[in-house]
């Protein structure tokens, strides 16, 4: 978990710019934040050390790599004991098709975002990995027809 630190407007500008443009140079980042490059780099490193910046990633077009199927799976478990929840999360982390895993409150225990090349690929994953997994009691799926919005990170205000 990220260490709580007080962010000023310069830190927020740096975070905003890096979240939108992860490859922005330190010089451009400093210019946008209104400071020189050396203190800007120190601030970026401090934000990384505090766990606020967790990494830098490329936004890859899944269709371009042949992943044309995106499915959301609502997974119910037989047991919600903490050890069983952790075991399921550990198992899910080994499946590259699962891009996101969220534990939910309510009738469903987990929501998984799964990508696949095609329906056969998804069905194979579903029947050979997800549904027979230990402690899984039921799985409901919903096919994503299209995505209207996919933003990473969080809204960053300047105040």
Labelled PLM ranges:
Residues 1-159:
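A compositional/biophysical signature of low hydrophobicity enriched in polar/charged and small residues
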């Amino acid at each position: 978990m990220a260490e709580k630190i007080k962010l000023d407007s310069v830190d927020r500008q740096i975070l905003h710019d890096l979240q939108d443009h992860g490859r922005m140079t330190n010089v451009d980042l400093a210019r946008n934040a209104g400071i020189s490059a050396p203190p800007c780099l120190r601030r970026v490193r401090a934000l990384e050390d505090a766990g606020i910046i967790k990494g830098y990633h490329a936004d890859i077009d899944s269709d371009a790599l042949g992943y044309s199927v995106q499915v959301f799976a609502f997974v119910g478990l037989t047991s919600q004991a903490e050890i069983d929840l952790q075991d399921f999360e550990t198992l899910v982390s080994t499946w590259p098709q699962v891009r996101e895993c969220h534990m939910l409150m309510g009738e469903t225990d987990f929501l998984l975002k799964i990508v696949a090349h095609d329906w056969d690929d998804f069905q194979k994953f579903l029947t050979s990995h997800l549904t027979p997994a230990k402690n899984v009691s039921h799985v409901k799926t919903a096919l994503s027809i299209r995505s209207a919005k996919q933003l990473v990170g969080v809204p960053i205000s300047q105040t």
